[in-house]
Regions:
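Hydrophobic/aromatic-enriched cytosolic interaction surfaces used to assemble or bind macromolecules
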Residues: 1-324
Length: 324
């Protein structure tokens, strides 16, 4: 099954986040969440974002969907070390088939993964101008190991579910949390960085079963990587280790052509509520750090019940991808 970055799926599909520590599902459309549920996953079913035990994943999903009476059409999210994200600049190409061929040709050189063992997708995220003054397309290309994707799909289909799209958790995270265009055009508040908000990148750091980082300008995710820090540990070492990984990620992102300066860091996921974590990180990386509204301003309308909203950020972003 292919990746479906930015592709439309049937309205009503459920965003399904297989976090590792838990599974979360959200159904949303028109800015409103209609259903949401989550359940703990047994230890060892998913490890470092990859399916370790297909049979137990299938049984867990059967139980979860039956108990919560959820629709069977789902949009999956993935995040692990078997995924590579790269930026390409290409000549301005209008024909879709020609663009796809050009992306694949350049991806073979840019991505250290045999493309015959990978699923590949891309998104055009804007335009640039070359040194000679000619227009160029800015493209984000994603490659994922096919064997890894197939294990997710096998586990999901075994539970009687119908996967209708596969997205990156990082893209879903940005989709759920990115500020609206109107907010992005607002001037900076007193004491904030002087650059216009729309010219700054935002770092999103999701502290779930997998710690995931994304850098975005507006709603365009330009860089992503899973982090190794275990936020569930206590003490100052967590903030210190996480700050170092965030710093290194920002440095790597800033080395890319056309990178925008980072203006802030937004934390999400269950780990984002750890006491004083945002303040400690801000002091260590010298950037504003805040805990994001976990559902990005979506109308919940009582759909969460007693659920922890911080579990549902990625699933909500996946659901928004299905409903857009």
């Amino acid at each position: 099954m292919a990746l479906t970055l930015g592709k439309k799926n049937p309205r009503g599909s459920v965003g399904l986040d297989l976090d590792g520590a838990f599974v979360a599902a959200v159904q949303a459309s028109d800015g409103r969440i209609s259903r949401a549920a989550s359940m703990e996953l047994p230890s060892g079913v998913i490890t470092d974002g990859e399916v370790s035990d297909v049979e137990r994943l299938t049984e867990s999903l059967k139980t979860f969907f039956k108990e919560n009476d959820l629709p069977t059409r789902v949009r999956l999210g993935v995040s692990n070390q078997q995924i590579v994200v790269r930026h390409l600049e290409l000549p301005l190409i209008e024909e879709e088939a020609e663009l796809a061929a050009a992306v694949r040709f350049q991806a073979a050189e840019a991505i250290a993964m045999p493309l015959d063992e990978a699923v590949l997708d891309y998104q055009v995220v804007g335009q640039a101008t070359s040194a000679e003054g000619s227009p160029r397309l800015r493209v984000v290309v994603v490659a994922a190991r096919q064997a890894m994707i197939e294990r997710f799909v096998e586990g999901v289909r075994g539970a009687g579910l119908k996967p209708e799209g596969i997205d990156l958790n990082a893209f879903a995270l940005v989709r759920a949390l990115a500020k609206s265009e109107a907010a992005a055009q607002a001037p900076a508040a007193e004491g904030e960085l002087d650059a216009p908000v729309q010219d700054l990148a935002c770092v999103y750091c999701h502290l779930g079963g997998v710690t995931n980082l994304a850098v975005a300008v507006g709603s365009n995710c330009l860089f992503t990587r899973p982090l190794s820090t275990d936020w569930s540990e206590q003490g100052d070492l967590v903030a210190s280790a996480l700050a170092e990984e965030i710093r290194l990620s920002i440095d790597f992102y800033m080395a890319q052509p056309g990178a925008r300066p980072v203006g802030e860091v937004q934390l999400s996921g269950p780990g984002s509520t750890h006491e004083d974590l945002a303040e400690e990180l801000s002091a260590l990386i010298h950037l504003p750090v805040a805990v994001a509204d976990p559902l990005g301003g979506l109308d919940v309308n009582g759909a969460l019940g007693g659920e922890d909203p911080h579990r549902h950020t990625v699933a909500a972003g996946l659901a928004l991808g299905a409903s857009s």
